[in-house]
Amino acid sequence: MKAVVVYESHWGNTAAIARAIAEGIGPEARAMSTADATSEAIAEADLIVAGAPLLGFSLGTESMVKGLAGEAAKAPSPPDLSHPSMRSWLEGLGKGSGRAAAFETRIWWSPGSAAKTILGKLQAAGYTPAAKPERFMVKGRYGPLKDGELERAKAWGAEMAKALSGQP
């Protein structure tokens, strides 16, 4: 199954989860940032999985993402702001007809959901949900990921691939 796992990541946590999901889906899955997820890459995919961090209790806006530059002094490393926000990427996504899923990285107690917003936008573009939105936890605002989350992400990818291939 050809799959693209698209991510917005600022401190590497969401990117790591995306790579684990792609590994779980199988050898024809690729993880790529919103900057690299071109319309050509998306058109070739049977499954699109998209994920972003929870910002401001939802999917971050472009101005919220740009505001992360002010976090550089507090964070262990500067945020990666080199790629478009997931919201911007989704706004540029053309109509599709394949399967899709969504995930988010977040602190456990935060209300709201980026993943539900992502999946809703994918559905509005014509994609059919392949799984319920998934949450992966970080230990603090900048990470790292909680123990076991990479393994859980890989398992989630494998479960989706199995379900979509019709295997019992």
Where are these regions (language model features)?
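Short gly/ser/thr-rich secondary-structure transition/capping motifs
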Residues: P27-A35
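N-terminal beta1-alpha1 ligand-phosphate binding loop
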Residues: M1-G26
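Helix-loop-strand module that forms the ligand-binding subsite of alpha/beta enzymes
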Residues: T34-T128
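A structural signal for isolated positions on well-ordered beta-strands in alpha/beta enzyme cores
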Residues: K2-V4, R30, A101
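Short, well-ordered alpha-helices that flank and scaffold nucleotide-derived cofactor binding pockets
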Residues: R19-E23, P27, E91, G120, ...
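Residue-level preference for long, well-ordered alpha-helices that form the structural scaffold
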Residues: H10, A75-P78, S82, Y142-L145, ...
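Glycine-rich phosphate/pyrophosphate-binding loop and the adjoining helix
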Residues: T128-P168
